[in-house]
């Protein structure tokens, strides 16, 4: 790429040699045109700020435009260019026009107040000054003009878009912006008053280039951080959506439950009010609705309390008296700071007083006094007695409800009025909160009223279903009962079986210990003793009739302990055990493929891990590792535009460094590898597979299949099917002529 200087800008072109020569001619012609323009301008004349000066300026602009046109014409006539060349030359033309405009602007800026104009001299290639027409020294640039140019450049760069971009990056960006402005200020101070605009501009460009490179690098880093954060957030999107789905479903269930509860309570309160107030039901409901809103209580609770209180107090106080008493008592309780629960207890105490007909210390000092401070003094002031006199009246049974309660109602009304009345009650925070709760309860009741028909139909359908399935339920109960009976019989049978096994074991031990050392040494290698031991095995099989039980006992090491304590090694006893079993009167059996043959039985009995393989029932979560690997934020996943699950190609270590993931496995292979390992471990430990017996007496293993489906974000991402086989405990069928007990 050749570089050619044209005036004060650099153009990089990749043309052929012919194009380069043409550009050289263009450069020469441009310089000649510029020199002609400068010679015309540098003529010594005075320009007045009038019509003639404007005409002179117009001529300058016209000459510059004419020069630009000649440049374009010379280029087009010198050679033919392709589209790229035309674009480059158009750019060159644009720069020439820009130069002409700059000349015009410089002329306007250089005009003095008295109309004098000082023109800047041009510079040729290599920085050589072009002498003005008429001789004399070259004219230098005025310092004040250069200073104004530097000031404009300084202000533009100081508040440029670059500094604003730096300030949006963050803490480091703000520091970089401050550093940039400080460096810019230092450069300006260094060149201030020197008139070296070109050098100043180059220094500023260097500073801007360095700052821009930092901005580009920082933007790349921030983009990487955002992408990593997005991928990590997307990796756990399925779990959050799953939890969110459960929360939404639970919230909907809770809303349905609360709706039904609120609706049923409202229906119950309405029904009770009808039964208690009779013809005055509508008036009572209107009072309850209005008063509940005033004191910030739920309408259902107010209606229920009012109805219950009226049931006991209405015969004594009448409808109007009951309403006034309830109103005064509720407002008085609110002023004394009673909560909704306290208000319920207070009204229950007043109800009991009214229904019993007498005021007793149990209600006044206990139930009412615990919830309403100053209750005793309230009653004493109402009837004009002292607390001691009040106690005596209650003790004598002379404090009647029909005489006392109306006076208490009047006293409570006086105290409420002194405290500010209903206005004071409505301004309490508890009242506002209660009103909000009441509106929510009304909303739930509205939901219930619109859905009550559907709820009733569903409830009836459920009841009919349960009634219709009663026979099936009874049959299921019989099945469960039979299973439990079988389990009980099995435990009883196992107990008897253990007694028999223990007897055979101790019999063999006692018989062996009665022998002397030489006889014991002979017996160790004899098939007779082995036959006795295997006879025990045959007896066990005949008695138990349970293959799993025999396998468990073998795994538990009962026969292994017999051989170990008798000093008989398990190695090399397979064939001897089979022969000894036949010699001992035990028919050799066909063993199922697996670990429970006659020889493998002995070997498994001496294996310390045999019992563990059989008896381990505390299995780990079989898919915990697979799920943890899939949802690991170190291994983020996402769905591509085709809806396929993909792994991110990069991960992040504990230090925050990005690493490329490339282990040679595809995404599905990684999932299946982890999933298969977990499922295989689960299948290996799930070794108690049920067996079926054919009519010929041979064991036939039933197949069990474990189907596992993984869903992520509502999409099925993997399906795994595993056949669970019993690799450790296979059923055996032993046939033995075990003598029955006499």
From Swiss-Prot:
Domain of life of the native organism: Viruses
Disordered: annotated span: 120-140
InterPro entries listed in its UniProt record: Tape_meas_N
Keyword field: Coiled coil, Viral release from host cell, Viral tail assembly
Its biological purpose: Serves as a base for tail tube protein polymerization and acts as a template for tail length determination.
UniProt similarity note: Belongs to the Mulikevirus tape measure protein family.
Name under which the protein is recorded: Probable tape measure protein
């Amino acid at each position: 790429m050749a570089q050619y200087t044209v005036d004060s800008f650099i153009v990089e072109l990749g043309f052929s040699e012919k194009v380069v020569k043409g550009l050289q001619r263009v450069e020469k012609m441009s310089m000649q045109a510029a020199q002609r323009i400068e010679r015309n301008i540098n003529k010594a004349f005075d320009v007045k700020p009038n019509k003639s000066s404007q005409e002179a300026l117009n001529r300058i602009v016209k000459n510059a435009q004419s020069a630009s046109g000649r440049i374009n014409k010379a280029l087009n006539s010198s050679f033919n260019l392709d589209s790229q060349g035309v674009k480059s030359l158009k750019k060159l033309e644009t720069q020439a026009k820009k130069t002409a405009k700059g000349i015009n602007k410089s002329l306007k800026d250089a005009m003095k107040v008295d109309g004098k104009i000082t023109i800047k001299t041009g510079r040729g290639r290599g920085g050589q000054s072009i002498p003005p027409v008429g001789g004399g020294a070259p004219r230098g640039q005025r310092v004040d003009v250069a200073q104004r140019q530097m000031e404009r450049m300084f202000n533009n760069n100081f508040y440029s878009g670059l500094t604003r971009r730096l300030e949006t990056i963050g803490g480091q960006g703000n520091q970089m912006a401050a550093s940039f402005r400080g460096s810019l200020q230092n450069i300006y101070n260094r060149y201030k008053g020197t008139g070296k605009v070109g050098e100043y501009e180059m220094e500023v460009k260097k500073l801007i280039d360095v700052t821009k490179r930092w901005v580009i690098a920082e933007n790349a880093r921030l983009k990487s951080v955002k992408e990593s954060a997005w991928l990590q957030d997307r990796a756990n999107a399925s779990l959050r959506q799953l939890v969110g789905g459960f929360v939404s479903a639970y919230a909907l269930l809770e809303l349905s439950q609360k709706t039904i509860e609120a609706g049923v309570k409202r229906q119950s309160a309405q029904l009770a009010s009808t039964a208690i107030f009779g013809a005055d039901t509508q008036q009572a409901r209107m009072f309850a609705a209005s008063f509940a809103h005033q004191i910030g209580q739920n309408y259902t609770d107010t209606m229920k309390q009012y109805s219950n209180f009226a049931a006991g107090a209405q015969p004594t106080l009448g409808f109007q008296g009951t309403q006034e008493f309830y109103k005064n008592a509720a407002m008085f309780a609110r002023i004394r700071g009673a909560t909704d629960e306290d208000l319920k207890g207070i009204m229950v105490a007043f109800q009991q007083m009214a229904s019993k007909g007498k005021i007793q210390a149990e209600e006044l000092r206990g139930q009412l006094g615990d919830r309403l401070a100053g209750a005793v003094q309230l009653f004493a002031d109402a009837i004009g007695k002292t607390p001691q006199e009040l106690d005596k009246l209650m003790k004598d049974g002379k404090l009647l409800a029909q005489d006392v309660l109306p006076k208490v109602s009047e006293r409570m009304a006086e105290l409420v009025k002194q405290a500010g009345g209903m206005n004071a009650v409505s301004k309490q925070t508890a009242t506002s909160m209660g009103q909000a709760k009441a509106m929510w309860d009304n909303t739930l009741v509205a939901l219930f009223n619109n859905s009550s028909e559907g709820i009733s139909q569903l409830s009836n359908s459920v009841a009919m279903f349960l009634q219709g399935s009663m026979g099936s339920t009874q049959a299921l109960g019989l099945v469960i009962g039979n299973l439990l009976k079988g389990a009980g019989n099995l435990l009883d049978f196992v107990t008897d079986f253990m007694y028999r096994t223990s007897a055979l074991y101790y019999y063999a031990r006692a018989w062996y210990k009665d022998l002397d050392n030489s006889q014991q040494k002979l017996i160790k290698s004899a098939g007779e003793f082995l036959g006795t031991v295997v006879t025990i095995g045959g007896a066990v099989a005949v008695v138990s009739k349970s293959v799993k039980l025999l396998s468990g006992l073998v795994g538990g090491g009962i026969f292994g302990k017999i051989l170990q304590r008798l000093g008989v090694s398990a190695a090399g006893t397979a064939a001897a055990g089979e022969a000894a079993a036949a010699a001992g009167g035990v028919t050799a059996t066909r063993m199922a493929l697996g670990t429970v043959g006659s020889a493998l039985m002995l070997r498994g009995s001496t294996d310390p891990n045999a019992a563990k393989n059989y008896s381990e029932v505390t299995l780990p979560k079989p898919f915990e590792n697979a799920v943890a690997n899939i949802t690991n934020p170190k291994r983020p996943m996402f769905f591509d535009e085709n809806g396929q699950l993909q792994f991110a190609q990069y991960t992040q270590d504990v230090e925050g460094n990005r690493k490329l993931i490339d282990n040679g496995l595809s995404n599905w292979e990684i999932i299946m590898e982890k999933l298969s390992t977990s499922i295989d471990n689960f299948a290996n430990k799930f070794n108690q597979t049920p067996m079926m017996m054919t009519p010929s007496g041979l064991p036939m293993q039933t197949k069990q299949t474990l189907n596992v489906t993984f869903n992520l974000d509502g999409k099925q991402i993997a399906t795994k099917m595993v056949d669970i086989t019993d690799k450790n405990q296979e059923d055996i069928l032993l046939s033995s002529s075990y003598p029955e007990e006499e």
